[in-house]
């Protein structure tokens, strides 16, 4: 019998990683213009494992600052609330993904590589477009495959079976999920994000990142996650580079002013961004969290 979305959400609702309480509160505080540095410091300090992960990531190659950051208040002042929010979400997502070592550890590393790449690409696209906050775009990109992460950790056999079906039959991973499980990782990820009280716009972006035209709250956020996902797959980063890849959404391309004929150029510019950026270091960010958890 296959698990339902509701059963999986209930299974992970109270994960022993402080995500159910601390992370949503941090997100709300970072988005509140009235939150002070002292208040945010006090909130995050209630979870010392999160403090450790934040400082590890802040000093890693990926989120590195010009000088070493020694304390949480210093990190908040130097990096800003938006980046702190992204760091908190990055840390807790990695904690979930790398909390155990097993036969799927390398596979999860590929999932993380893809997720991080989509986050970076979404941030770059948002900066170029100018009407979406870059850090919100990063979070939407980073979490777009949250449902896949949940499956790989808590339903390993189903995850492996779906992955093999997608590769063997040359259908999309989403189609393989629907055929074998009756739900998609996008649906599961959105439900888990809602259970963790993440913002509704991010939940919607997760749910609709394969079909951004279905988004109604903030379509641009779903579109940027969709385009970034497509481009990172096109670059060959992640698990599903050999699976069927549908064409990018035309409305999303138009919204981001990317003519279809220009897609190869945009993807190549993204390749250069990754190649030139010391920050795109999956191993460094993974090691930072492994040392802290």
Where are these regions (language model features)?
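Terminal helices and disordered tails flanking the catalytic cores of nucleotide-processing hydrolases
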Residues: 1-8, 250-293
């Amino acid at each position: 019998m296959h698990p339902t979305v509701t059963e999986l959400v209930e299974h992970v609702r109270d994960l022993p990683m402080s995500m159910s309480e601390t992370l949503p509160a941090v997100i709300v505080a970072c988005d509140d213009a009235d939150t002070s540095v002292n208040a945010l410091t006090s909130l995050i300090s209630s979870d010392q494992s999160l403090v450790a992960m934040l400082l590890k990531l802040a000093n890693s190659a990926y989120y590195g600052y010009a000088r070493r950051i020694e304390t949480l208040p210093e990190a908040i002042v130097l990096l800003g609330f938006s980046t702190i929010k992204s760091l908190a979400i990055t840390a807790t997502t990695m904690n979930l993904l790398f909390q155990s070592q097993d036969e799927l550890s390398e596979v999860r590393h590929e999932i993380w590589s893809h997720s991080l790449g989509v986050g970076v690409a979404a941030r770059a696209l948002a900066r170029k477009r100018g009407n979406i906050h870059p850090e919100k775009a990063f979070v939407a990109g980073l979490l777009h495959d949250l449902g896949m992460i949940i499956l790989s950790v808590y339903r390993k056999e189903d995850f492996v079976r779906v992955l093999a079906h997608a590769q063997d039959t040359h259908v999309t991973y989403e189609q393989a999920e629907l055929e074998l499980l009756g739900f998609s990782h996008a649906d599961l990820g959105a439900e888990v994000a809602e259970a963790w009280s993440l913002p509704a716009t991010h939940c919607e972006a997760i749910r609709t990142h394969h079909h951004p035209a279905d988004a109604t709250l903030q379509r641009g956020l779903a579109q940027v996650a969709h385009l970034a996902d497509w481009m990172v797959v096109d670059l060959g980063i992640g698990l599903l580079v050999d699976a069927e890849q549908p064409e990018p959404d035309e409305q999303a391309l138009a919204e981001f002013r990317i003519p279809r004929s220009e897609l190869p150029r945009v993807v190549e510019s993204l390749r250069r961004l990754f190649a030139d950026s010391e920050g795109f270091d999956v191993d460094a960010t993974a090691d930072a969290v492994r040392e802290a958890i």
